[in-house]
Structure formats: C-alpha cells, structure tokens
C-alpha cells in the first residue's frame, strides 16, 4: 500500500471516510437524542484517547533492548501543536456545552479542516514509499480516524439537529481559529521552555525551526522558501506584519528585514479566507432563513425603515446620555 495523490489508496481512504459518515447518519438518524449524543461524544473521546496512545506506535516510539521507548517526536507530538490536534483536545468539551457560538465554531472549523485533509492527506503522503508507509501503518490509521472524526462529528451533529447553525454567527469561524492559534502558541512556548522542541534555530527571527503546520509563525519553510499553501495566506497579509519594526543587533537584522509577526500576520487572511467559506457552509443549512431575512431587509429599506431605525437609535443614545449625566443635562 502506498498513498499518493489520486492513486487507488488515495480514493480508497476518501471513499471509506465518506461511507462511514453516510453509514452513521442513516444508522442513527431516527435514534433518540440521547443515543445520538452518546455516539458523537464517544467518537470524540476515542479520538482524544488515540491522541495520547499514539506514543506507543511508530514513529512516536520504538523498541530498545526489549523495552518501548517514547521518541523525542512522540513527546513533542503528544502536545496540541496544530489546528487539528488542538481541536481533538477541545471538541469533547465544546460538545458537552450548550453554547451555540462554540458549536458553530466546532462545525465550521471541523468541517473545513476535515475537507482539506480529505482531499490532501499530506501526512501519509509525506511518509514516502510503500515500505515507509507500511512501517507506520497504525499511524496512518490514526491520522485518518482523527481527521475524519473532526469533520464527521460536527457534520452529524447538525444533520441530526443536535445543533442549529446560524449564518449570523459565521464570525465565530475566523475569531475562533485565531483564538485557537493562541492556544497552540502557548503549547509551543511551553514545549520550548521545557526542552521538548527547539522552537527557533540560529536564524531565530527569520524562520521557524519546528512545527509550523498551522502557519502561526509565518508562511516560510525552514529553508526560507515560501510554502505553497502559506503563500495563499501571504497574499492577504498587510506588509506591516511582514517586517521587523526595529533593528535586531543580536542577529544582524536591520529594521524592515523580512520577519512575519507571529499570529498577527494571520489576522487579515483568516477573516478574508475563512469567513466566506464558513458563510457558504451556513447557506447549506440556513439558506432559507438568510433568504427570508434578505427579502425583509430589502422591503424594509424601500419602505424607509432605515430612516426610522436611525431615529430610534438617536433617541436611545440621548436617553442613555441623559440617564448617565442627569445633572449636566439639567444645567444645560
């Protein structure tokens, strides 16, 4: 078995994931809400367990003199250092909440990241030839389960009406992904401080040294070249977030040298790219309400409703000011 773009095994795993999602949908679509919630939560918990158990399979561990030893990569990757890994940790807790904003985030980011991996399974492909992939077959299984789970659970949650999406809450997708990146940064800083990863190399302020799969530290590869996917985000990044604001004498870098501001450089691209994708997903499930709201809004404008709205807003502002400073208003 060797997984390559568009070969038999590429489509095999894709069809298997789609089939599993469709199968679960029909198997439990008429079940009681308690059963549906139990199935979905069990899948999430199983994913969290697998995340830590992966330290006991190659390449995260190896046999040394008859004993299983966790490798340095195993210790590094047991943390939550990319978007999918962080969601594996957070989704079980989000699912238990009744917060509609968090569950909208769970749906949008889960489905979007799951679809990306469904069509571009980068990690298995990067393992190399058939021998290398077979040596790490259990990790390939883990990879596909985790990324299928991240997509399937939120999708089934909405299809089974365990949660109702709203197009008015699409803003939680870009905001949520940016907050998630702060969580990842915190993980990586702790890892670096505790010695699990050398977060920076000798050119510390130029390119990241390890674990930048979520592009938090910039779109550049370790050799300084532009990553193909990161380059898409780079198009929408303001120039101010691509340069050093001051000189850094310790590294011989002058003010204005190329340096992507960690996290900040992703703010504008996240809103420009993620928001329309999340809105598109919302239209699948909330398109009718959007249509009705649009018709109402157009009629409201034609009837002169906006003018009345601004008048009411003005009265509310004056009332609020009056209640806050009654003495000043009386003096006037």
Residue ranges of each PLM-predicted region?
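Membrane-interface transmembrane-helix boundary segments in multi-pass integral membrane proteins
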Residues: 2-15, 171-179, 193-283
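A glycine-rich, hydrophobic loop/mini-helix early in the fold
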Residues: 37-92
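Aromatic-anchored segments of alpha-helical transmembrane domains
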Residues: 46-56, 110-122, 177-188
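Membrane-proximal helix-loop-helix units in multi-pass membrane proteins
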Residues: 88, 94-153
């Amino acid at each position: 078995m060797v997984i390559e773009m568009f070969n038999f095994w590429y489509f095999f795993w894709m069809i298997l994931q789609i089939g599993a999602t469709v199968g679960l949908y029909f198997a439990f679509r008429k079940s009681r809400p308690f059963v549906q919630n139990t199935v979905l939560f069990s899948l999430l918990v199983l994913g969290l367990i697998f995340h830590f158990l992966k330290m006991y399979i190659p390449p995260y561990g190896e046999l040394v003199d008859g004993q299983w030893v966790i490798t340095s990569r195993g210790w590094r990757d047991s943390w939550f250092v990319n978007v999918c890994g962080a969601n594996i940790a957070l989704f079980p807790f989000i699912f238990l909440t009744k917060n509609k904003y968090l569950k909208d985030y769970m749906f949008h980011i889960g489905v979007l990241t799951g679809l990306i991996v469904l069509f571009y399974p980068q990690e298995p492909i990067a393992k190399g030839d058939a021998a290398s992939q077979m040596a790490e077959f259990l990790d390939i299984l883990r990879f596909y389960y985790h990324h299928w789970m991240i997509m399937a659970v939120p999708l089934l949650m909405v299809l089974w009406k365990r949660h109702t999406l709203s197009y008015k809450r699409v803003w939680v997708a870009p905001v949520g992904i940016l907050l998630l990146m702060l969580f990842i940064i915190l993980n990586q800083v702790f890892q670096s401080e505790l010695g699990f990863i050398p977060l920076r190399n000798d050119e510390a302020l130029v390119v990241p040294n390890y674990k930048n799969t979520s592009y938090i530290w910039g779109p550049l590869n370790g050799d300084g070249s532009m990553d193909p996917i990161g380059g898409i985000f780079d198009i929408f990044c303001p120039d101010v977030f691509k340069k050093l604001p001051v000189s850094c004498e310790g590294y011989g870098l002058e003010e204005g040298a190329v340096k992507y501001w960690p996290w900040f450089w992703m703010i504008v691209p996240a809103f420009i790219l993620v928001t329309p994708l999340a809105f598109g997903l919302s239209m699948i499930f909330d398109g009718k309400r959007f249509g009705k709201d649009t018709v109402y809004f157009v009629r409201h404008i034609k009837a002169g409703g906006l003018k009345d709205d601004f008048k009411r807003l003005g009265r509310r502002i004056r009332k609020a000011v009056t209640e806050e400073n009654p003495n000043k208003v009386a003096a006037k």
